[in-house]
Amino acid sequence: MKFPHRQLLIAAVCAALAGTAFAAPDAGIASLAAKEKPALLDTLKELVSIESGSRDLDGLEKISDLIAGKFKALGGEVELIDPSAEAYRMEDTPEKMGRVVRATFKGTGKKKILLIAHMDTVYTIGMLNKQPFRIEGDKAYGLGIADDKQGIAVITHIVSMLQQMKFKEYGTLTVLINGDEEISSPGARALITRMGAEHDAVMSFEGAYVKDDKLSLATAGIASVTLHVAGKASHAGSAPELGVNALYELSHQILQMRDLSDPATGLKMNWTISKSGSNRNVIPASATAGADVRVLKVSDYDRIEQQVNERVKKQLIPEAKVELKFERRRPPLEATDASRAMAAHAQQIYKEELGRPLGADDKAAGGGTDAAFAALKTKAPVIERFGLQGFGAHSADAEYVLVDSIEPRLYLGTRMVMDIARGKTAR
């Protein structure tokens, strides 16, 4: 693959910052970031060219082998872990999930640093033919390229840069890549939580936004509520009194839970789907409904689960059987003083050494993240969106990353690992 002429990032940055008081970027890191750019694009092409939907076990096996091989070549101690045995099983959880790649690099220092991303996508087998990897101008397109194959590529080449610099001042540098993120990480969540608790800092490499480049310190938590009502069928015209109307009971349950949202705390619960009956002239024997729940604090999970379990006991029709299932699909990621301090350090690097703006959002927004699992049992900083700037996640024909964001993100990620290892990011 041929690439246009590249100037070293250091030269461009120094020109941009001429006459300012900003610190000059590290010439060695900047030079390596420029050198790694074409190699990272090659890695992206390899990753995108393997279909790896969350339920495509063959594809996930192929891509996990590829990823494992890359980290072995970089000198890591690599494990392929089957997460299925300890899965948190939800209604849509498959019997088996893709393997987790864990690569461990031992250093000479004390700090333990965890880098995470995911290899699975939302796409089904055969869709790659409609959107193969390609580069058009400053955009690299491909299925899953932004969410989250770029994250794998960025981590891979950060590790490569550290190896080339012979940097080993960390105690342990761990890479964790799972294959079930797009289905709420039912298998990998327990491992991610344990690993988060064992490390001094967690950097997650979901992609950043194109128009608003910023790190995420907080995301909303996601839960679901499913109601199943069993009644008794009967003829709606000649003998409705002999039936038990599951739809009536379902409607009652939905209405009595319609006020559980709490704007003051950001808790949201909305009933969004329902199904009942098969014929107009038959009293429905079954009915189901589902609600979407969003929370900003882990403690709100406990509160809303307790509330729905209390409300469901108040039935309209005693003869109906009501079952409720509350599924914690993703916890919220909550901003902490530690994550704010680490984000401020990253912002300083971006501004003073690269001359680029970088936001840090500590207000929860958007979808869930595996970083939230990593933060559940730790007080260490956990930050999301260290990946490339991109757009079109979950889009079958428009998903891309910005090629020009490769060098800055490689520079930032490498500097952050080095500074965390040296204890420079805490304030």
Model-assigned labels for residue ranges:
Residues 144-220, 262, 421, 425-427:
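Acidic/histidine-rich catalytic neighborhood of metal-dependent amide-processing enzymes
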Residues 123, 129-133, 139-173, 376, ...:
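A structural preference for long, well-packed, hydrophobic secondary-structure segments
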Residues 24-28, 52, 69-77, 207-212, ...:
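Metal-dependent amide/peptide-bond hydrolase catalytic core
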Residues 137-147, 358-361, 396-397:
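Short pre-catalytic strand/loop immediately N-terminal to key active-site residues, enriched for Gly-Thr
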Residues 18-21:
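N-terminal signal peptide c-region/cleavage motif recognized by signal peptidases
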